[in-house]
């Protein structure tokens, strides 16, 4: 849990963990201490965590969650939808990886359709779409049928996709470098989910 009354300090405390190369297959879920933290400050810290390469976040403690904070979240994100079918990272890492990546795809599709910030050439655009669909297929297959072979396929597809991502984003990064960095962080989170799942699921069972 990170205890900070301002977002810059919160970021300084969180980043050594979010950028650590020593966590291995550990899922990182930072916590925000709500006591004495203004509602707008809480929202600011929540937004920061959404943009970092973490698996989620926790709010501590429930009795400090107030009506004003609830109103801010509703006004910026809408009313909370029924999320009972959303996968849980700790217990459903493969499904979570596919689910999170599907959300990324929707953002990219919106970008290409609603703006001119497309990949830097027609051939690159076609290659990007082929590669991101290939990765989605690999993650979906892994979520449906967890196995060592499907995990290898998903990891290979993800590594290949990440290696070309900066090249594909050479135009968008000029207009909105922060957003591109957020996307890179979300790909890192998916990579972390696969590492966690490999240790938790694949290495503890025998698959054909």
What does each model-found stretch correspond to?
Residues 1-10, 16-20, 24-114, 161-168:
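Substrate-binding cleft of secreted/luminal carbohydrate-active enzymes
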